[in-house]
């Protein structure tokens, strides 16, 4: 079974590119990472930084998560991210996404030993 940490990497990490390559980036990535298998995942963020840099956020600024839990952490520096948002015309199984590139601070929830990101909470 996929671990929470591995799921975070599959859903949110794209260290191989420094930014979204094209407007078609989200359509390709959401499909290749199996985020459109059973339904169209409405919103998803990919982080274009090294895994080590993203894992390091777990020892940075402790903040409250959206759901009220206290195991969220905000990155000290901005990171290159791509937001994927489902378009109005998107219909499963033909999921369609708008690709938006940004440089923002990320907020992730961390747990486990080693203490690693398991959930992408927000970008600010």
Swiss-Prot record:
SMART domains linked to this entry: RNAse_Pc (SM00092)
Catalytic center residues: 12, 119
InterPro entries noted in UniProt: RNaseA, RNaseA-like_dom_sf, RNaseA_AS, RNaseA_domain
Chain residues that bind substrate: 7, 10, 41-45, 66, 85
Glycosylation sites: 34
One biological process term in Gene Ontology: defense response to Gram-positive bacterium
Keyword Lyase: yes
Purpose of the protein: Endonuclease that catalyzes the cleavage of RNA on the 3' side of pyrimidine nucleotides. Acts on single-stranded and double-stranded RNA.
Protein name in UniProt: Ribonuclease pancreatic
Gene of this entry: RNASE1
């Amino acid at each position: 079974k996929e671990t929470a940490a591995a799921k975070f990497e599959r859903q949110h990490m794209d260290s191989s590119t420094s930014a979204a390559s094209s407007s078609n980036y989200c359509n390709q990535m959401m499909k290749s990472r199996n985020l459109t298998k059973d339904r169209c995942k409405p919103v998803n963020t990919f982080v274009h930084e090294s895994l080590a840099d993203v894992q390091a956020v777990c020892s940075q600024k402790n903040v409250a998560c959206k759901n009220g839990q206290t195991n969220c952490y905000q990155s000290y520096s901005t990171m290159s991210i791509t937001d994927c948002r489902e378009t109005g015309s998107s219909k499963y199984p033909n999921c369609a996404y708008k690709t938006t590139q940004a440089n923002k601070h990320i907020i992730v929830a961390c747990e486990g030993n080693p203490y690693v990101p398991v959930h992408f909470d927000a970008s600010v």
